[in-house]
Amino acid sequence: MIGYEIFVRSFADSNEDGIGDFIGIANSVDYFKKIGVDVIWLTPHFKSPSYHGYDIIDYFDTNPSFGTVNDFKSMVDTLHANGIKLVIDLPLNHVSDRHPWFKAAMRGEKPYEDYFLWAQPHFNLKEKRHWDEEFIWHERNGKTYYGVFGGSSPDLNYDNPQVVQKSLDILEFWLNLGVDGFRFDAAKHIYDYDIKEGRFRYDHDKNVNYWNLAMEKAREVKRTKGEDVFAVTEVWDDPEIVDRYATAIGCSFNFYFTEAIRESMQHGGVYKIVDCFQRTLGKKSYKPSNFTGNHDMNRLASIITKEDERKVFFGLLMTTPGVPFIYYGDELGMRGAYDSTFSEDVIEPFPWYASLSGDGQAFWKAVRFNRAFTGASVEEQMSRSDSLLKEVMNWAAFRKENEWLTNAWVENITHNTFTVAYTVTDGKNGIRVYVNIAGHGETFEGIALKPYQVKIL
């Protein structure tokens, strides 16, 4: 199984308004097949006032820029007809400050006032979140509310059973529309507060209990249809913490994998890779999801600038266990730098054509990193026999021939400075992989390796 993250606005435009949409995605199934995609993750497609969509106004409707609910259903049907599953990004921790629930809460209306978290007189309103020292309490019209992701995204109160039930209703609605599952955004933030003291504090026990409940509901809905649910969680934390959430949800993005390989390629030496494999890719009760990057990170090609090194990254990605995910355009070498206050540079329009002009090409924003005729387009990559895209297509074919890798694990890891070797097995099948990340030849365990080579025995 291979996953593919799509930022809807940037991928494929079906009506020439410059904005990617559901029908554009449906029209792209031939491309998905070429790169071996089995499951697509859509970033938020709901009604939202922002370009990124993570602050939601209505969980039960689509962003009209992307199409109607009927267009969404048509896209789902087309993907399913071509053997491709769909998971949707679901931010359940917070809503937009323009959401009807929050507007009613600000007016003091019941039951909506109890959907949110309000400051008490003894709270320290200068309390900040851990990772960047931003305030978590926000004052408006004489009321102070909790919003760990900013004042425009007030947190929901999951100590209120009504809020929990609303979240389960949202899951059921989209599962009944045909989605195969979810990417659960900010999973450790459902309970990230001490309600008695007004402090920012993760409660992993309560979070995991909630996700067990959510997955029980999702499986129940799918069971009535004779189908399975696929869900993946975002928990950016130590592997030991990730394990707890992943066990509940079934699959989790492996941030350490992405960080370790990027750092190793930048600075030389495989020690981070070895540590990552030992801590995250052993035998688990869940599937890890190793990935090239996402919308919250610098683009792969902006960190690993040599195409040969990016080919090594994809070799590592495709020979390790679980469900590998490709961030749209990473298979082409798209570039982009992430800024926490301005993430548009990592979500530029997907370049179908060398000229950035043609049927299906999105153009909702001016490009900064991926300009015309710079080599990172489908058209240009397909014209080269040695391109990164062609390499990814080859790895996709390998993955299709070895579907057992989804449920495998890594063992017997050995290494020198620039080479790592590892065995991948599911107990019945197995491969031995040798990877040289250096720009010079290496010989390890009697195996001769060319520069930047991934060899399977």
Describe these PLM feature segments.
Residues R201-F230, V235-W236, E240-V270, D339-D359:
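Extended substrate-binding grooves/exosites of carbohydrate-active enzymes
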Residues R9-F11, K47-S48, L92-N93, D180, ...:
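Short, solvent-exposed loop/turn segments at secondary-structure junctions
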Residues R219-R223, A246, I273-D275, R279-S285, ...:
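Loop/helix patches that line or flank the sugar-binding groove of alpha-linked glycan CAZymes
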Residues M1-L168, E172, N176, H189-V242:
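Acidic/aromatic-lined carbohydrate-recognition and catalytic surfaces
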Residues V37, V179, A187, G322-V323:
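A structural motif
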Residues W174-L175, D180-F184:
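Active-site regions of oxyanion-processing enzymes, predominantly non-cytosolic
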Residues I40, F182-F184, I326:
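Hydrophobic residues within beta-strands of alpha/beta enzymes
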Residues K103-Y145, E263-L281, E348-F373:
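Core domains of carbohydrate- and sulfate-ester-processing enzymes
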